[in-house]
Each structure stands twice: as structure tokens, then as C-alpha cells.
């Protein structure tokens, strides 16, 4: 567990092949700690961060970049300033240099106040995080499989159930590399084999889902 003032980082999955980091932040404004952390990312990433209109989005983008670098450095022993990333439009970022002995797959997600980042050495990985809040139930017919809709409607905590399903679906489609361009209603995250590859956690008021598929 790591503390930077109001920033908390913890590992919620820690196995030989997979690490998942959760970051929570209560900071409302950009400050000295963010200037400090900016020194750990590339000039290109800083430029991208600065293009965001709102400070909250800039901070989340910075956290996602820093925690990704932290995870890779810890896993590989490569120095931070040696890391080079390829970030194709609308696709998962990859580590383009240096070459590692073991192929790495990683993914991150952020929402208001939190970042989730996952890294795996033997699987493709997709992650998603959402704060539990008032859910947009009017979207269920467009995005939920009938079995998922039944699960939500029969739950005693419908908001939590909605975001459980939503994060599972996001994590799965990110892991598959399709994103949300597919017919989401056709994907049942509660049925095998999909459900066997997804883990979902509640962490500090957030729903976190992690999908891994063996390479």
C-alpha cells in the first residue's frame, strides 16, 4: 500500500502472473504532488494530459500513466525512463520498448476518484472500474443480456448490481480487444465460459472487474 497525501494505491490481485492495482484519490485540484508525478511520464503523455479541459480528468490520466509505469517497473525491473509505449487510437496501449523476457499485457480504467490497472504475464487482460451511484437503468435494454437484466432487477441493491454487470462487460470486451463496438446484449457475463474468466470486487465504494484470458 502506498500513500501520496490523499492518494491511496493498493494491490487487490497479487499472483505470480497477474497484478491489479487500485488507486483512490480525494484531491480536487492539481497541486505540487501532480507536478512531481508528471516527472515520471513522457513528454508526449504530459501533452495528452494537458489537453484535458478539466483538472479531474487530467489527474486521472496522470494517475493511469504513473500506475502503469509503476506496475511494469515492479514486474520487470526495467528502469522507468527506458519504457516506451505505443498508444494506437481506440486500442489498448502496449509496451513497444524495451523487449521483455515475458510478454506483458496491461489495461487500465478510470472513473471519478479512482483508477484500476491490471498487468498479466500469461494472459490478455481487461479491467473496468465504476463508482456505485445512481444507475442509468434506462440503458439496460440496449446493453444487457436478458439474464443480466433479470439479475439486476432481482437484486436487493440494483445500483451495485448494474455496475457489476457493466464493469464485467467492459472488462470482457476490452480483454477481447473489441471494446463496446459489439452487440452488448448478446454477451452474457453471468454464464460460462465468460463468467469463469472474470473477477469482480467492491473496493471503497467502487465496483472493479478484471477479465483474463489465457494467451
What are these regions (language model features)?
Residues 1-15:
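N-terminal amphipathic/basic-hydrophobic helices that include classical n-h-c signal peptides
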Residues 11-215:
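Core catalytic alpha/beta fold that binds nucleotide/phospho-ligands
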Amino acid at each position: 500500500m502506498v500513500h501520496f497525501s490523499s492518494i491511496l494505491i493498493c494491490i487487490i490481485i497479487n499472483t505470480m502472473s497477474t497484478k491489479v492495482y487500485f488507486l483512490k484519490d480525494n484531491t480536487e485540484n492539481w497541486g505540487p504532488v501532480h507536478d512531481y508525478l508528471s516527472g515520471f511520464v513522457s513528454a508526449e503523455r504530459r501533452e495528452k494530459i494537458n489537453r484535458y479541459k478539466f483538472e479531474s480528468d487530467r489527474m486521472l490520466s496522470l494517475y493511469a500513466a504513473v500506475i502503469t509505469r509503476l506496475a511494469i517497473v515492479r514486474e520487470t525491473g526495467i528502469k522507468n525512463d527506458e519504457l516506451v509505449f505505443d498508444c494506437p487510437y481506440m486500442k489498448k496501449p502496449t509496451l513497444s520498448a524495451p523487449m521483455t523476457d515475458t510478454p506483458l499485457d496491461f489495461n487500465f480504467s478510470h472513473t471519478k476518484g479512482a483508477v484500476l490497472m491490471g498487468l498479466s504475464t500469461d494472459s490478455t487482460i481487461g479491467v473496468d472500474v465504476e463508482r456505485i451511484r445512481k444507475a442509468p437503468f434506462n440503458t439496460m435494454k440496449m446493453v444487457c443480456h436478458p439474464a443480466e437484466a433479470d439479475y439486476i432487477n432481482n437484486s436487493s441493491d440494483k445500483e451495485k448490481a448494474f455496475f457489476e454487470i457493466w464493469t464485467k462487460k467492459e472488462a470482457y470486451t476490452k480483454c477481447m480487444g473489441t471494446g463496446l463496438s459489439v452487440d452488448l446484449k448478446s454477451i452474457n457475463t453471468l454464464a460460462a465460459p465468460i463468467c469463469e474468466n472474470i473477477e469482480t470486487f467492491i473496493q471503497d465504494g467502487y465496483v472493479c472487474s478484471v477479465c483474463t484470458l489465457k494467451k
